[in-house]
Amino acid sequence: MLDVKNTGVFSSAFIDRLNAMTNSDDGDETADAELDSGLANSKYIDSSDEMASALSSFINRRDLEKLKGTNSDSQERILDGEEDEINHKIFDLKRTLKDNLPLDRDFIDRLKRYFKDPSDQVLALRELLNEKDLTAEQVELLTKIINEIISGSEKSVNAGINSAIQAKLFGNKMKLEPQLLRACYRGFIMGNISTTDQYIEWLGNFGFNHRHTIVNFVEQSLIVDMDSEKPSCNAYEFGFVLSKLIAIKMIRTSDVIFMKKLESSSLLKDGSLSAEQLLLTLLYIFQYPSESEQILTSVIEVSRASHEDSVVYQTYLSSVNESPHDIFKSESEREIAINILRELVTSAYKKELSR
């Protein structure tokens, strides 16, 4: 289940829908994606409205708690090691904390040796702050170390903390190290690449079969992040991040549409072309619409022995036609791609009829 004790600004129906995504089997990846598919556009709009409402509510929230907070799950969010190993490390740090005052360099070195990721270091220190009978000096020193770790990298640290539970859940589902997923979420929050490049990057890093799951992971991590005591972004930044996520979900919608087109065509039957290769071609068309003909050249060269050119061109034309318009930078770029593809279809049909 989605690890949110207080769903905060989100409706229970929205949280239930997201929990259903996490609990779905691998075979239901396409079904997950279709929750925001252009084939069911009202669902996509509902999701966008929920996110807009969430952002509005986030802006109006009160100041959050100070450094120590009231979290009791700091240790559960640590990703560096198995549970028993983490328990041992935390126990050793607690023992060292009681034996050393003031805290010396050895304590800090041990902390960084045990937990290499800054988010895990902060979580471990917060766990120590929950210890009873700490002196005022110990609290002050632990707080100072936390502030030193966070200084200049607060967004990255908080993003790593807030995505940790989801990284564990999805890491288990995808058979991936949760640290990789945490890095993925950080990259999404802090990165500045185009949404199509982001989708291509995830496709390359996590594989064709996991591409929809990664979008679900990022979405759920973002929800937890926004609803956390110490979010990674301010309201303005979250607005930008939400717009990126919505754009990526539009690309996933196009992905779903395209896969349905491929399933109903003959392009995948002889094995000369892979679904991943064909999807990448579509993504490149979204990025460089004026070069659509050149982008399709490599596909045509491979497919020509088994398929008519018109089948390839028509598949891409109908997919672009049915995809959300805002995938393109402008309506004019979309029209450029459609016009080029339409001309290619017409030309291919004429050649095939003249044989």
Curated annotation (Swiss-Prot):
GO BP annotation list: negative regulation of protein secretion; protein secretion by the type III secretion system
InterPro entries, A to Z: HrpJ-like, Invas_InvE, MxiC_C, T3SS_LcrE
Gene3D superfamilies: 1.10.10.2060, 1.10.150.630, 1.20.1280.240
Keyword Ribosomal protein set for record: no
Keywords: Plasmid, Secreted, Transport, Virulence
One Pfam family per UniProt: HrpJ
Key word Transport present: yes
Subcellular location: Secreted; Host cell
GO CC, any one term: cell surface
Alphabetical list of NCBIfam families matching this protein: LcrE
Function: Necessary for the secretion of IPA invasins.
Name of this protein: Protein MxiC
